[in-house]
Regions:
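C-terminal capping/gating helix-and-loop segments adjacent to ligand/active sites or protein-protein/ligand interfaces
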Residues: 361, 401-411, 421-441
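Extracytoplasmic/periplasmic substrate-recognition and gating elements
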Residues: 94, 98, 119, 333-402
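Hinge/lid segment of periplasmic solute-binding proteins
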Residues: 60-63, 129-180, 184-187, 225-230, ...
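Glycine-centered hinge/linker elements that transmit conformational signals in sensory
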Residues: 210-214, 264-300
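Short, solvent-exposed loop/beta-turn-alpha elements that line the ligand-binding surface or hinge
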Residues: 145-159, 201-202, 239-242, 257-282, ...
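Short, well-ordered beta-strand elements
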Residues: 67-78, 97-102, 125
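Extracytoplasmic "Venus flytrap"/periplasmic binding protein-like
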Residues: 90-156, 168-169, 184-198, 316-317, ...
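Extracytoplasmic/periplasmic solute-binding protein
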Residues: 60, 166-172, 177, 207-268
Length: 441
């Protein structure tokens, strides 16, 4: 009920501002985590003890893996498809256990999962996004309470439990999203005559963000001439294609929900009142007005186009998350932006006290093991997951190739992701800013 009511309200808000902005002269030329909770002292001790057993656990997993079972992982994240394919190949080479990884296309995971689960060889490993997803797939979720991946969680908060208290899912990645920005372009802008800020650090509210974006949009030709960029707009295109619209229909929509929950001191409700709907509308309006494209073409704009616009330095601001780091820094994509050029700031919507707001941090990625699979395949899947979080190969892949921040105690030292967005999230927390919880899953 909550999601349906919100969907109708926000869809109306989006359409209203898109049509209103179609003739707006501001549009550009037409041309993709930090652990918010601190570890308890007990968890810290457990982490220290875990360091001494990681290697042996990985060896035991490889030694005990049975050749009679197999693993079929239906992966949710297209960005990490190749890394999972590579990791599956390494595991099969070491153990002889077949591991198949199939990745659903952007925005199609639920329908793909339904289709695959109806087959005789269904996924043995899949994911749900949280309580809402669990409600749909609870009859397929094996109890992970005694599994290695559950035992290695740094906090019970990352275990997704059913009504009976069984662990039906385990979070495997903590993610953060906000407004990714190009430090180089923004810093260059700050040196211009009559720039509205002298440092990116001054952006700590919607009003300040809007003032900067409006000025960049109005002066993009001047910026290009002075610094040699090919800037097309302040923000990347806010595409409403299925590969992109989730950024606004769920992630952006989380902000008004978060502030309404915060005001009421609640964590869930059957239906929101829409207290911050106007705030949602104004940030959305800013996205589509100070953009690389006219509002009238947004329906066909894709996530890949937005990613490319940011990567090729055609835009300064790009709403997305930590998962996008790998794509933006992948040399094969030929992007101009580098890791050193990028930062992430909070999404400001004009809510009271937002100057103390951090980035949006949480998880909608929970591993679930299909309890309707054979016993051999269930055990093979549990062994594979144990190897992933304990072995050098698995941890290196998740931390570096995939760029994940994980909730597992085994990811320390060299296995902490070198992701600048995660570093920014940690810095906001260190500075006393409050992370925004995820309330849409």
């Amino acid at each position: 009920m909550k999601r349906k009511v919100l969907s109708v309200m926000l869809a109306s808000a989006m359409l209203a501002t898109m049509f209103a902005g179609c003739g707006n002269g501001n549009a550009g030329n037409t041309s993709g985590t930090a652990n918010a909770g601190n570890k308890t002292e007990e968890a810290a001790k457990t982490e220290e003890a875990a360091k001494t057993t990681e290697a042996s656990d990985a060896e035991k997993t490889a030694d005990s893996a049975s050749g009679s079972g197999s693993v079929y992982y239906l992966n949710f994240k297209p960005e990490q498809d190749q890394a999972w394919q590579d990791l599956a190949g390494i595991y099969t080479e070491q153990t002889g256990v077949p591991v198949t990884v199939i990745t659903a296309a952007d925005g199609t995971y639920e329908q793909t999962l339904k289709s695959e689960m109806a087959k005789s060889e269904a996924p043995t490993l899949f994911q749900v996004n949280g309580p809402v997803g669990l409600a749909n797939w609870k009859d397929y979720c094996y109890d992970l309470s005694d599994s290695e991946i559950c035992k290695q969680l740094s906090s019970e908060d990352f275990a997704l439990k059913n009504d009976a208290g069984e662990v039906s899912g385990v979070a495997y990645v903590l993610e953060t999203y906000g407004i990714i920005y190009n430090k180089k372009i923004l810093n260059d802008y700050c040196t211009m005559d009559n720039a509205v800020i002298s440092s990116p650090d001054e952006i700590n509210s919607f009003d300040k963000l809007k003032a900067v974006a409006d000025d960049i949009q109005a002066r993009k030709d001047e910026i290009n001439s002075q610094f040699g960029y090919d800037l097309q707009g302040a923000f990347t295109s806010a595409g409403m294609d299925g590969s992109s619209d989730w950024r606004f229909k769920t992630h952006l929509a989380n902000l008004p929900i978060y502030y309404e929950y915060k005001d009421k001191g609640i964590t869930s409700t059957d239906a929101i009142e829409g207290t911050y709907l106007d705030n949602y509308k104004q940030i959305w309006d800013l996205y589509i007005t100070d953009s690389t494209c006219e509002p009238g073409v947004l329906s066909s704009k894709t996530g890949d186009e937005a990613e490319s616009e940011f990567g090729m330095e055609e835009a300064v601001f790009y709403q997305n998350g930590t998962w996008e780091y790998g794509n933006l820094t992948n040399e094969d994509n030929g992007y101009l932006v580098t890791a050193d050029d990028m930062g992430m700031m909070p999404i400001y919507i004009g809510a009271p006290g937002e100057e103390n707001q951090g980035l949006c941090t949480g998880s909608e990625n929970y591993w679930c093991v299909n309890k309707q699979a054979s016993e051999e395949d269930i055990q093979a899947t549990l062994d594979f997951l144990s190897w992933v979080i304990n072995s050098d190969e698995g941890r290196d892949s998740m931390a570096h190739a995939m760029g994940f921040t994980t909730p597992f105690l085994t990811f320390t030292g060299d296995y902490v992701a070198d992701n600048v967005f995660i570093q920014d999230a940690n810095q906001y927390i260190a500075d006393g800013k409050t992370p925004v919880s995820w309330n849409f899953s």
